[in-house]
Structures are given as C-alpha cells and as structure tokens.
C-alpha cells in the first residue's frame, strides 16, 4: 500500500543559489533490474535509485527467483528463476505491472499481480492480450489488475502485433524479456500514435548494452533475437525527469541551481528540460558535466508537443500557470492513463488556485491568471505533488495535500527541496 499521506505547506522563495545532486534514474534502474534478473551471470548496478517503485521491482523479482544484495551505494544482483506460486504488489508502478508479467511467464508457478486502488484503473489490456497471444495463460475477471500469470518456464515468442497507444511500457515490457523467448520476438505496434518513444529507445540501449541483438526495424516495429542476456556492471545515470522541479524552482524564483553529472548524451526524456525551460525564460548552460539554470525574472508561456516526453507535463504546466503569456501543451492524451488522469488533475488544481486552464482533446491550454493560496491535491501522483510545490514557491499559502507520494521516485524530496531553498 502507498505511504501514509502527509500534507505540506509549500515554502515560498525569493531566489536561491544551490547545487542539487540527483539520485539515479527510475526508468534506467527498473530496466536494469529486470535485465539483471534475467541475465546469465551476476550484475552490479552502480548508484541505482532506491524508492518505492524500485523497491517494488526488487521485491517482485525476488519472488521470481533473483537475489539482491546491497554493497554500499551499489546493488549486486544474482539471477534466478522461481518455481513457486507468488503474489506481487505492483503499487502504482507502471514499470512493475507491465515489465514483470513476461518475467513471471518465464518462471514456473501461478503469479498473482495486484497493486494500489488507483493501479486497478491503469490500462493493462495490452499486457494481458500480449501474453495470451504468446501462449501464456492469464487468469482475470477483467483485463486489468488484479490478474494472475501461470508460468511454465518458457515463452515461444515469434511475431506479435499490439496496440501500445496507451503506453510505450507495453512495448518495453515485452522487449526486455524477449531474448529469453524461444524464438525471440518480432514486435509491431498498430494503433494510434505511440507515446514516449524515447523510453523505447532507452529499452533498446539497455538491451544492446547487455549483448542482446535488439533493434528497431521500422517506425513502429522492433526485433529481439533469442540469446543470453549478459551480466554487467552498470552505472545508473541521475534521474533527469526528477531534475524538473528543481530546475523549475530556479526559473520561477529567479534563482540558480546546478545539477552535477548531467549526461552529454542520454535516452532520458528529462534531458529536454534544458531546452524547454530555456524557451520559458531561463538561462541554461552545460559545462564539465554540470547543468546550470538561472531564472531571469521572466516566465514565458510555451506551445509544445510533449508526446515524446509526457512525464514532463506536470512540471511544465506548473511553470505555465505562473507565466505571463499563454501555453498549449499537446500530444499528451496518453496521460489520462498515468498514475491519475494528469490532464484533468492539472486543469482542476490550477483552476482551484485561480488559474485559467482548460482541457484539450490531447492536452492542456493555460492562460495567465491571478493565483492565490489553497489546497493542491496530489491524486497519489508524485509529479502532481511536485507541481504543487513549484507553484507554492511563488504563491503563498499553497498546501500540497500529500507530499509523501513523492517517495515513488524521490524518497527525500522534502529534504532536498528545503536544503535547496536554504531552509535546512
């Protein structure tokens, strides 16, 4: 179950000068955890993220036979395949509910999946249909959590066509395990626009980094050859999506923040924050691996297609609510199936503080408004919670109703936030 709710009176700030060291990427950590559990030899993950989502992933993979051991800030992983029935808690982690079922099918036993109440509303039809098409037995009352995978220790693989328009995680979840399928996998997407393509590129990069033959064969098609997944020592990059609130804080307050170990090349969509916040008024530079962002006193609106980087939307929307010109954030219809319906939630919360936001078919329109304090609801969504904290830097009296939900990807968010602001 999720952490106990904790309300948070968001502190205001007139600017600051700080360096913020980010923990590891959730997206990379959970992909490397899956590959390490399926590998032919042990692995070591250097600086992985330890948060609710990654703990849920570790617990799930342990129940399927892998072993994990802490070594300082690193994590040692010994692969293994389970042969017992098990119950897996997905929490609200899309990566767990969509990446682990194929792994469960490669184990032997009846593996039950469930999660938080909100997780039962998240799209899962494609995962269940995919497994059934691959010959895996799945038990369910409806094609959503809870369900059970009956693993036989093998998946034939072959050709598979799916509709992944609700989430790129449906593609990544299959690709990550596909090298262990008897015939590998030829996967194609047939449906509406595929969101968050950089996340699929990240999945392919992690696979090839483990010696797997994995490639994109057409605009919406991928191929993974059968074979071993190598053990490896993998450095986990800082989580650039989690950089968003800290970068936004500098922009909206006129402060300066430095983020060390910012990669010059990455598959993380959070790298787009440097460009997007530059367009919204910040001065941004990257020198010797440190990204520096300074607010200029100007906050511009933005018209942007975020289809490839939808998870950045709550942060960009929070900045847009404080901007002096209108914004349009489009290409993000798939956010309706995230931790909550992020489009409806952002519109409701911005408007509740006196802002002017409207839902579009595939996004949000935000105009300058006269904001005031009030309760900002987080909807058990970590990025909604941090969006409220951003607005609270400028608007006095904002109370985030549940800051504890940030533990999903950033366990010490409040400590990092207040240290950045000079309050600790």
Task: List where the protein language model places each region.
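Short, structured segments at the rim of ligand-binding sites
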Residues: 1-424
